């Protein structure tokens, strides 16, 4: 709940509402006291199985002052069994629609014979970003983007820049003498990898074909001209080179890069 940003200020409330102390059911009860119709909201929360939100979830630090009194391990002297809690996955705010699988949370797991999680070597975190089209549609019409000729290409550029900056910040967050390793992977990283494998080095390709040509000629060449097949090897290498060139030309013709 502490990782969830956002603060709401309501009339009559001295403290701002945050996820660490927001109880949806208690909030609806307060709305009922001022004769506010909450039937549709109650139905929505019940269908999504929101309940008390994060208020009835275990705290990582039971002695934390912000740990709600409704937490099952409030003021407990024992640390929570995180492995048991994460075994099989865990739930977000909605127990019906926000279930995070165990494979998306931890890695390098060790389990007992019953499949219960005992320990893990890595903690995983995932951020789901908008697609360029979704981001363009979301901010279209905002005054902040009117002066930059807002379009999908600019949205894609912003998403790419954010991912690159995120990777850089993550790598800088770990001290050099730390025993822990932080690995980051984004769609931009995947695109860079694919691009690096797609780039064709003329020197490397030419060197490779020259080596193939020399190998084919030397292995098939004989001193006896009647038994020598060096020309066949030369023709075979040239045929392969022309086939590859034709394939690349066809890909370029149909727009595959």
Swiss-Prot record:
* Domain of life where this protein originates: Eukaryota
Q: Which InterPro entries match?
A: SSD (IPR000731)
On modification after translation, the UniProt record reads:
Glycosylation is necessary for SHH binding.
Topology Cytoplasmic: residue spans:
221-235
The residue spans the entry assigns to the Extracellular side of the membrane are as follows 1-199
Q: How does it sit in the membrane?
A: Multi-pass membrane protein
What switches on expression, per the entry, is described as:
Activated by Sonic hedgehog.
Instruction: List, in alphabetical order, the GO biological process terms annotated in this UniProt record.
Output: negative regulation of smoothened signaling pathway
Provide the transmembrane region boundaries: 200-220, 236-256
Report keywords, A-Z: Glycoprotein, Membrane, Receptor, Transmembrane, Transmembrane helix
The family line of this record is:
Belongs to the patched family.
What's this protein's name?
Protein patched homolog 1
Instruction: Please spell out the taxonomic lineage of the organism that makes this protein.
Output: Eukaryota, Metazoa, Chordata, Craniata, Vertebrata
């Amino acid at each position: 709940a502490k990782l969830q940003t956002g603060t709401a200020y309501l009339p009559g409330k001295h403290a701002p509402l945050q996820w660490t102390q927001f109880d949806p059911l208690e909030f609806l009860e307060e709305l009922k006291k001022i004769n506010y119709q909450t039937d549709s909201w109650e139905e929505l929360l019940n269908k999504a199985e929101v309940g008390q939100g994060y208020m009835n979830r275990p705290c990582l630090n039971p002695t934390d002052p912000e740990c709600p009194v409704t937490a099952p391990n409030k003021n407990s002297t024992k640390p929570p069994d995180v492995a048991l809690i994460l075994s099989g996955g865990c739930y977000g705010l909605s127990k019906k629609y926000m279930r995070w699988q165990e494979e998306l949370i931890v890695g390098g797991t060790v389990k007992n014979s019953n499949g219960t999680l005992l320990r893990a070597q890595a903690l995983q975190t995932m951020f789901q970003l908008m697609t360029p089209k979704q981001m363009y549609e979301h901010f279209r019409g905002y005054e902040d983007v009117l002066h930059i000729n807002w379009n999908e290409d600019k949205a894609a550029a912003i998403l790419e820049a954010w991912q690159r900056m995120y990777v850089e910040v993550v790598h800088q967050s770990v001290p050099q003498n730390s025993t822990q390793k932080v690995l980051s992977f984004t769609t931009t990283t995947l695109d860079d990898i694919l691009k690096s494998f797609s780039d064709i080095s003329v020197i490397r390709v030419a060197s490779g074909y020259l080596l193939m040509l020399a190998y084919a000629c030397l292995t098939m060449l004989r001193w006896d001209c009647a038994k020598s097949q060096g020309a066949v090897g030369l023709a075979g290498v040239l045929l392969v080179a022309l086939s590859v060139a034709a394939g690349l030309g066809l890909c370029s013709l149909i727009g595959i890069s």
